[in-house]
Design a protein with these regions (language model features):
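A conserved beta-strand element that flanks and buttresses the S-adenosyl-L-methionine
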Residues: 35
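S-adenosyl-L-methionine-dependent methyltransferase catalytic module, highlighting the catalytic core
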Residues: 44-52, 62-182
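Short catalytic micro-motifs in class I SAM-dependent methyltransferases
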Residues: 38-42
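Class I SAM-dependent methyltransferase SAM/SAH-binding core
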Residues: 1-23
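Helix-loop segment at the mouth of the active site in Rossmann-fold oxidoreductases
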Residues: 24-26, 43
């Protein structure tokens, strides 16, 4: 996403290209699968970015999006100020409920909430995040862009199987940890 990083990557492969913030530099239906891992919370137009991910994947191909869940309502030891504290967790819960109602009543008005980046030293993870990503909206925008959502999980890395099942078995997965969503573009 940044010019200097693309230049570094070009030393290894010529397949890296700069994303201009609007259009991914690939043709329609180019890839069998695409993924955005910890990217969505940093782009200026996340709704359009999801549409672009779907555009460049072939029909039947998979889209994987993993981002922090900034609307956590459950959890301890959260790393970002938006996730920390009982007051924020209550506000996050209320905001998610409002968003769910909005998705049903007025889908065209749904947008990810934006955040101001945090400027502090030392830099902390996701201080530069500008989008309050969450599973509900990632799932919603994938479905709006002609995808079937296959999985929504709160774990974005390997955990012991019994713990993984317990964390991702029920609806609480939408209000914990991360937003890990796998979808398939409809044929």
């Amino acid at each position: 996403m940044s010019g200097p990083n693309i230049e570094k990557a070009k030393r290894v492969t010529d397949r890296c290209q700069l994303y201009d913030g609007r259009t991914l530099p690939y043709g329609n239906a180019t890839f069998d699968s695409v993924g955005a891992l910890n990217v969505l919370e940093h782009v200026e137009e996340p709704e359009a970015f999801i549409a672009e991910l779907v555009r460049v994947v072939k029909p039947g191909g998979k889209v994987v999006i993993s981002s922090p869940n900034f609307f956590r309502a459950l959890g301890l030891r959260d790393y970002h100020p938006k996730m920390r504290g009982i007051g924020n967790k209550w506000r996050n819960w209320q905001r998610l409920q409002a968003k769910r109602r909005q998705m049903m009543a007025d889908p065209s008005s749904v947008h990810f909430d934006r955040m101001e980046p945090i400027s502090r030293k030392p830099f902390q993870p996701d201080d530069d995040a500008i989008v309050a990503t969450n599973s509900f909206e990632i799932k919603f925008f994938l479905e709006q862009n002609d995808c079937d959502v296959l999985r929504v999980e709160c774990t974005d890395r390997h955990v012991a199987k019994p713990i993984d099942i317990a964390l991702n078995l029920g609806p609480w997965r939408y209000i914990m940890f991360n937003a890990f969503v796998v979808a398939r573009r409809k044929s």
